[in-house]
Amino acid sequence: MFIAWYWIVLIALVVVGYFLHLKRYCRAFRQDRDALLEARNKYLNSTREETAEKVE
């Protein structure tokens, strides 16, 4: 079965575009996750300090 050259080019462009989209999306997701984790850690540390002050 003959596949026209433009179908091969189209499939290659879709694959490359999908790869670049995933790369960008994963980077943004990682930055969001790191920011949320940092905020959570700050909150937990401040809560621990307040609890330690109340106990003393």
UniProtKB/Swiss-Prot annotation:
**Keywords on record:** Cell inner membrane, Cell membrane, Membrane, Transmembrane, Transmembrane helix
Q: How does it sit in the membrane?
A: Single-pass membrane protein
Name used for this protein in its record: Protein YqiD
Please list the coiled coil stretches. Answer: none
Q: What induces it?
A: Expressed approximately equally in exponential and stationary phases (at protein level).
Lineage of source species: Bacteria, Pseudomonadati, Pseudomonadota, Gammaproteobacteria, Enterobacterales
Q: Where would you find the membrane-spanning parts of this chain?
A: 2-22
Main localization, broad class = membrane
Q: Any idea where this protein resides?
A: Cell inner membrane
Q: Name one GO cellular component term.
A: plasma membrane
